[in-house]
């Protein structure tokens, strides 16, 4: 009798932070769903097929990531926190999402275009004025989304370093391993910050998200605690993911100079370039996906999944599904566009899609014109990935120009 093979273990890190994991590609080639072992030691399933991932993400038979069964509940104050969208589902989730959705609509985001461009231009100038090598993370990828989300929400630019640091701490160890005490404290501090800003907005309302949330409270659409949680969640989500995508996108352009030259030669390709960056390096590219929990026994691609199992939807892995993308391992900014799952899918799809795309288009539409010789100051493998944070990104991103 042959010995049972050990289960593949997650996470499966990229090679030099850029190339897809060979283990992931080999596993993905064997089908769209796989039995795996998670860092916590629990066993479960990893969905790597594009169609199968969409099916899970849109199926009400699965609980969202923020509503795990008791056996898997991590020690985190965020789970179950009022207004934290991933901790709500069904009508409650739809009610809360409808409150913040207008702030991230195409109309509201279009009003921010000039402001985002001005913020980016200022940060490009600040970066260019630094002695070389300089940390692009400190001077561009970290502050830009923080300053943009502060404009959308109606909080002071001067506060961006404060709440960006808190959002960083909140997202630390929100996967399955590691201590969470600092994360809990940061979440409560962030909520206290939001409460104070909401009190200020009572006296000085304006066209921004905090004012919208106060109106929702006054109209009985949300409790004050739900409004605070929604605002805090938007600050975190509106900042963390884009930081990593700017950094991964630049890495991809450095790795593929011909693609960079195409973009510089034809700036109209920026929309396609951003979509290819999103496909290859979706939010959480440093991790393996987002969790779901079936309420009852289900079947995925012929695989029986018992109720309350861990089912990780591998958003980054779905980008390499050859049944959906031609030559998926090739980074090609002129790729024939097909929908990807960078922003998830279904009722819990990312609400800030338009804003994230705008930020990335502004950065990649002008950074190589502003800094034509921009390049890494170290080898890619020397960059230190923030493995403890689910959105990924790097501790520092030293560049020359």
Curated annotation (Swiss-Prot):
**CDD domains noted in UniProt:** Cyp158A-like
* Residues annotated as transmembrane: none
| Keyword hit for Heme | yes
EC numbers: 1.14.14.-
Per UniProt, the enzyme's principal EC class comes to oxidoreductase
Q: Can you name one GO molecular function term for this protein?
A: iron ion binding
Gene3D superfamilies (alphabetical)? Cytochrome P450
Cited PROSITE patterns: CYTOCHROME_P450
For activity, the cofactor(s) needed are: heme
- In which residues is heme bound? 350
Keywords from the named record: Heme, Iron, Metal-binding, Monooxygenase, Oxidoreductase
InterPro entries in the record = Cyt_P450, Cyt_P450_B, Cyt_P450_CS, Cyt_P450_sf
Q: Of which family is this protein a member? A: Belongs to the cytochrome P450 family.
The UniProt function text for this chain reads: Cytochromes P450 are a group of heme-thiolate monooxygenases. They oxidize a variety of structurally unrelated compounds, including steroids, fatty acids, and xenobiotics.
Q: Extract the PANTHER family matched here.
A: CYTOCHROME P450 BJ-1 (PTHR46696:SF5), P450, PUTATIVE (EUROFUNG)-RELATED (PTHR46696)
Protein's name in the database: Cytochrome P450 BJ-1
């Amino acid at each position: 009798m042959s010995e049972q093979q050990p289960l593949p273990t997650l996470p499966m890190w990229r090679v030099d932070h850029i190339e897809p994991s060979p283990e992931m590609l080999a596993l993905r080639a064997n089908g769209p769903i796989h039995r795996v072992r998670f860092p916590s030691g629990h066993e479960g399933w990893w969905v790597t097929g594009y169609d199968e991932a969409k099916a899970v993400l849109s199926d009400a038979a699965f609980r969202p990531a923020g509503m795990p069964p008791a056996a898997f509940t991590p020690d985190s104050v965020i789970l179950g926190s009022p207004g934290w969208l991933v901790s709500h589902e069904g009508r409650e989730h739809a009610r809360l999402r409808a409150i913040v959705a207008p702030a991230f609509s195409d109309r509201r985001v279009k009003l921010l275009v000039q402001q985002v461009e001005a913020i980016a231009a200022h940060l490009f100038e600040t970066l260019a004025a630094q002695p070389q090598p300089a940390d692009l993370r400190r001077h561009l990828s970290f502050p830009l989304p923080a300053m943009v989300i502060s404009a959308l929400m109606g909080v002071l630019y001067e506060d961006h370093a404060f709440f960006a640091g808190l959002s960083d701490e909140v997202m630390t160890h929100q996967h399955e391993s590691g201590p969470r005490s600092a994360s809990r404290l940061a979440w409560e501090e962030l909520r206290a910050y939001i409460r104070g800003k909401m009190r200020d907005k009572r006296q000085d309302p304006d066209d921004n998200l905090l004012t919208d949330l106060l109106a929702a409270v006054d109209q009985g659409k949300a409790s004050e605690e739900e409004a605070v949680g929604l605002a805090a969640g938007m600050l975190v989500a509106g900042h963390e993911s884009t930081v990593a995508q700017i950094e991964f996108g630049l890495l991809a352009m450095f790795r593929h100079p011909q693609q960079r030259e195409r973009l510089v030669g034809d700036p109209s390709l920026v929309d396609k370039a951003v979509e290819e960056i999103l496909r290859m390096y979706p939010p959480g590219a440093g991790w393996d996906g987002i969790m779901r929990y079936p309420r009852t026994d289900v079947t995925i691609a012929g695989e029986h999944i018992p109720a309350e199992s861990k089912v990780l939807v591998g958003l980054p892995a779905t980008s390499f599904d050859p049944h959906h993308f031609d030559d998926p391992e090739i980074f090609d900014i002129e790729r024939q566009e097909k929908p990807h799952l960078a922003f998830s899918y279904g009722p819990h799809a990312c609400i800030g899609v338009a804003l994230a795309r705008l930020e990335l288009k502004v950065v990649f539409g002008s950074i190589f014109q502003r800094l034509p010789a921009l390049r890494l100051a170290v080898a890619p493998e020397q960059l230190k990935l923030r493995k403890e944070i689910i959105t990924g990104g790097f501790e520092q991103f030293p560049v020359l120009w």
